[in-house]
Amino acid sequence: MKRQKRDRLDRAFAKGFQAGVGGRSKEMCPYSNLDSRSQWLGGWREGVDGRITGLFTK
């Protein structure tokens, strides 16, 4: 059975989350498309929030 590719916006969110948990700057967002950039930044915010509250460590 074929695997479906993940939605691009879901992938952008996940990559942003990983960047936030890893402590990267939000200025390093690789997306120029507004929708993808918004999703990436949303994931980044959640990742940073999780790191600050102690859910994740580097």
Swiss-Prot record:
Underlying gene: rmf
Role description: During stationary phase, converts 70S ribosomes to an inactive dimeric form (100S ribosomes).
Protein family (similarity comment): Belongs to the ribosome modulation factor family.
Name of the protein this chain belongs to: Ribosome modulation factor
Matching Gene3D superfamilies: ribosome modulation factor like domain
InterPro entries: Ribosome_modulation_factor, RMF_sf
Signal peptide positions (record): none
Keyword Cytoplasm: yes
Cellular compartment(s): Cytoplasm
GO cellular component, one term: cytoplasm
One GO biological process term: regulation of translation
Keywords: Cytoplasm, Translation regulation
Domain of life of the native organism: Bacteria
